[in-house]
Curated annotation (Swiss-Prot):
Residues at which substrate binds: 144
CDD domains named among the record's database cross-references: SDR_c
A GO term for molecular function: oxidoreductase activity
GO biological process, any: antibiotic biosynthetic process
Residues reported to bind NAD(+): 12-36
Pfam families recorded: adh_short_C2
Active site residues per record: 157
Keyword Cell inner membrane: no
Key words of the record: Antibiotic biosynthesis, NAD, Oxidoreductase
Family: Belongs to the short-chain dehydrogenases/reductases (SDR) family.
Protein name in the entry: Granaticin polyketide synthase putative ketoacyl reductase 2
Keyword Oxidoreductase: yes
């Protein structure tokens, strides 16, 4: 378990006002990390999430904007004096059937890649000098199994997750030994967005009927995987599948 404050390590989790990111923030806080909670829009949810955690900080920032990504990292370091873990969870998608090519407009591509790929990159670059000084710096990118198979809520989303994987491995090969870079690639996870979507209902049923573990994932499943990679000091450049065995099909 991480040490107690004021020397406790600091974790920044982007996109952590709800869903997977919120659960990751809560899990890291339970391990003794001081957590920086972030969102671009859901300010009230972000503030409530941070208020429920010990010595947590909420920062509103849109990491798809370079200045905001830098401000987010700078605010975290100014507040705590250090940064040890970065979890790049902020992301977006559109529910677009893969066959509907015309619906995947250039604007959709720019929106999704701008946050999922460029936003992840900008935040990581801003955080890297601080992570390198940590002595145990770790980056975990939250990706998706859509990055490795013809799946996902849209083609632009799947491509963005392929970018996550490449970014993870290239950075791991570049910034070691000072910083480790890994990723988790979840399958279908039960979040308010997926549970309240007609688009995902048949996909969820297919997962429950066909995958080895016969269930969809929970945010807690992803949070445990993230924590495992943060702890795994001899592991870098890995993309950990958290999909109940869907990749075996």
């Amino acid at each position: 378990m991480a040490t107690d404050a004021p020397e406790a390590p600091v974790a920044l989790v982007t996109g952590s006002s709800s869903g997977i990111g919120q659960t990751v923030a809560q899990r890291l806080a339970a391990e003794g990390y001081r957590v920086v909670v972030n969102s671009a829009r859901s300010v009230e949810d972000g503030e409530k999430t941070a208020a429920a955690l010990p010595d947590a900080l909420y920062v509103r920032a849109d990491v798809s904007e370079e200045a905001d990504a830098r401000r987010l990292v700078d605010t975290a370091v100014e507040h705590y004096g250090r940064l040890d873990v970065l979890v790049n969870n902020a992301g977006r998608t559109r529910a677009i059937p893969h066959a509907d090519l015309a619906a995947a407009t250039p604007e959709v591509w720019r929106e999704i890649l701008g946050l999922n790929v460029i936003g992840t990159w900008q935040t990581t670059v801003a955080a890297m000098p601080h992570l390198a000084r940590s002595g145990n710096g770790s980056v975990v990118n939250v990706s998706s199994i859509a990055g490795s198979r013809p799946a996902g809520s849209s083609i632009p989303y799947a491509v963005s997750n392929g970018g996550h994987r490449a970014q993870t491995r290239l950075l791991a090969n570049t910034v070691g030994p000072a910083v480790r870079v890994n990723a988790v690639a979840p399958g279908l996870i039960e979040t308010p967005w997926t549970q309240n979507s007609d688009f995902f209902a048949p996909i969820a049923e297919h997962v429950r009927q066909t995958t080895p573990l016969r269930r969809t994932g929970r945010p807690e499943d992803v949070a445990e995987a993230v924590l495992g990679l943060v702890r795994a000091t001899y592991t870098t450049g890995q993309v950990l599948l958290v999909d109940g065995g869907a990749h075996l099909l």
